From Swiss-Prot:
Reactions that this protein is recorded to catalyse: propane-1,3-diol + NAD(+) = 3-hydroxypropanal + NADH + H(+)
Protein name per Swiss-Prot or TrEMBL: 1,3-propanediol dehydrogenase
EC class: oxidoreductase
Domain of life: Bacteria
Required cofactor names: Fe cation
């Protein structure tokens, strides 16, 4: 392969493994935090002795005062950020602790941006638009999927236009990420399935991205291998600690990969489904992934053949194209095995919206690193294939 200059961004400090949550208080201390805004959702806050309660325990044990904002919604909205910012300012917080999956992490990043930048958040959509440092962010992760705890991406929904927008900046990187698989035990099967397919999409899109490099390739390949071997088990038995730990590790690797290699049309298209229909992000990715993969296959069949082998397919004696086709079959079979809906029509999507969603998908920042350049008609056709 040809080598070029590339950068590689991850949070300053990353903790992984059982009981990793125990470091959250001391890490906030080391970052100079006196009063934390804990950003989460009402469902997580209601769980007795769950991730929120454990985080509160270790923060208070370290002498950190805490104000709680639990108004985060799925596909976090600009209004969630506005409400969280009001708490951050009213309580005079100086550090942000996010607890949950991608929605609390993205909302927390949005609060940090809004606290340090003037004007509407939408004006910062794009790459490296932020000019000021954010408050320190400590991200406590509870799902194996979005990997927002280790990325520079902040994905929010404009409630007026119902369009998701992405603010990509190294300033969004949490100061500390915490992945404790014990916090993931007992998550519902449907959530595990959706977030797991989100992680697979991250790994696949990073691996075939135009911006891939040797380091992101290594992370993405191991993530694909781990997901293929562990996602079914994690869905089947949520208390399977080995499967949970492997999925948490896979999600972390996939996040490190796409944080630097970027993504592609699956995410660009899924963002339209999330913005317009409030569809769970992992489900949108899972439905679209096989169809976008088929579209992208001719751009890099060698890497799709690699994906097939990483997912356990026997490609001995096959041509590169035939081996690449097996990757699509393996992705589809995994999605079906774990109960992911297979058609957009079953999720309330309207065909009449495809032209608009195709237009907006090509404007999404994730579209620019897709390995095959498409037009609105081709993107609309992929939506129809998934319908």
């Amino acid at each position: 392969m040809s080598y070029r200059m590339f950068d590689y961004l991850v949070p300053n400090v990353n903790f992984f493994g059982p009981n990793a949550i125990s470091v959250v208080g001391e890490r906030c201390q080391l970052l100079g935090g006196k009063k934390a805004l804990l950003v989460t959702d009402k469902g997580l806050r209601a769980i007795k002795d769950g991730a929120v309660d454990k985080t509160l325990h270790y923060l208070r044990e370290a002498g950190i005062e805490v104000a709680i904002f639990d108004g985060v919604e799925p596909n976090p909205k600009d209004t969630n950020v506005r409400d969280g910012l009001a708490v951050f300012r009213r309580e005079q917080c100086d550090i942000i602790v996010t607890v949950g999956g991608g929605s609390p992490h993205d909302c927390g990043k949005g609060i940090g941006i809004a606290a340090t930048h003037e004007g509407d958040l939408y004006q910062y959509a794009g790459i490296e638009t932020l000019t000021n440092p954010l408050p320190p962010i400590v991200a406590v992760n509870t799902t194996a999927g979005t990997a927002s705890e280790v990325t520079r991406h902040c994905v929010l929904t404009n409630t007026e236009t119902k369009v998701k927008f992405v603010i990509v900046s190294w300033r969004n990187l949490p100061s500390v990420s915490i992945n404790d698989p014990l916090l993931m035990i007992g998550k519902p099967a449907a959530l595990t399935a959706a977030t797991g397919m989100d992680a697979l999409t991250h790994a696949v899109e990073a691996y075939i991205s135009k911006d891939a490099n040797p380091v992101t390739d290594a992370a993405a390949m191991q993530a694909i291998r781990l997901i293929a071997r562990n996602l079914r088990q994690a869905v089947a038995l949520g208390s399977n600690l080995q499967a949970r730990e492997n999925m948490a590790y896979a999600s972390l690797l996939a996040g490190m990969a796409f944080n630097n290699a970027n993504l592609g049309y699956v995410h660009a298209m899924a963002h339209q489904l999330g913005g317009l229909y409030d569809m769970p992000h992992g489900v949108a990715n899972a439905v679209l992934l096989p169809h976008v993969a088929r579209y992208n296959l001719i751009a890099n069949p060698e890497k799709f053949a690699d994906i097939a082998e990483l997912m356990g397919e026997n490609i001995t004696g096959l041509s590169t194209l035939d081996a690449a086709e097996k990757a699509i079959a393996a992705i589809t079979r995994l999605s079906m095995d774990i109960g992911i809906p297979q058609h957009l029509r079953d999720l309330g999507v309207k065909e009449a919206d495809f032209p608009y969603m195709a237009e907006m998908a090509l404007k999404d920042g994730n579209a620019f690193s897709n390995p095959r350049k498409g037009n609105e008609q081709e993107i609309a056709a992929i939506f129809r294939q998934a319908f």
